[in-house]
Amino acid sequence: MAETIEVPAGGYRYIPGVFQYSAGVRALDGYRIERAEFARPVRLADGFAFIERYLQQQGIPLAGFCACELRSPAAFTDAGFVAFNRHYVGTLERWGVMRDDKNPVARSNVCPELHKPAEPSFHAFCFTRPVPGASGSFVIAGSGEAEEGHAAYRDRTVRFGDTSPAGLREKGIYVLNRMEQRMAAVDATWADTTATQVYTAYDLHPFLGDEIVRRGAAQHGLTWHFARPPVVGLDYEMDCRSVPVEHRVA
């Protein structure tokens, strides 16, 4: 099980991941994670500017920014994904949230099949707020059906290129197991979640009941986004969270 690292200034601890995002975050005792979803996608630069103003108006330090959900117009090549991520983390470095390639912020980044944004954009973000007696809220970062942190995703992808029912089932099982491993690292299970999201352009019904619902991953329903993971060749992604307060922002 992965060891978590505390971010006292942000009021949370995180599961170390790759330089572009952590594998998940959990609020420290006395803090609550809240989620804010944009009414429509907001391009990256404008989204970061909005988040900075929003947190300042709420009296929350930038260190409290702990997770986000992005939308991109199309899947990246491996090299393109690295270049995008270097651009993305630049703001986190400027904010002092990320140092020495250690990124505490959880993230998902997916590509809608329809109604695509013109450029990479924010869909939602999460932050911590001091609340006496609060505990237990968490966000698990998105994961596709490949081992992360390698130069070529293709070489570490489950059933690469196989979108048959059997192939998708195996991809789905891999990702569900990854979600459970990450939740275990923050002392949580499916029973603690308030929302589960899946991102795929393929039919998940053949394993929806047997694999997703049966293990408790859809106790509050399942939000299915008709979208693809952010790297060419990946077909299935999930994330989940336990967030007691959610907002809609302009």
In which residue ranges do the predicted regions lie?
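Short, polar/acidic, helix-capping and beta-turn segments at strand->helix junctions
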Residues: 1-250
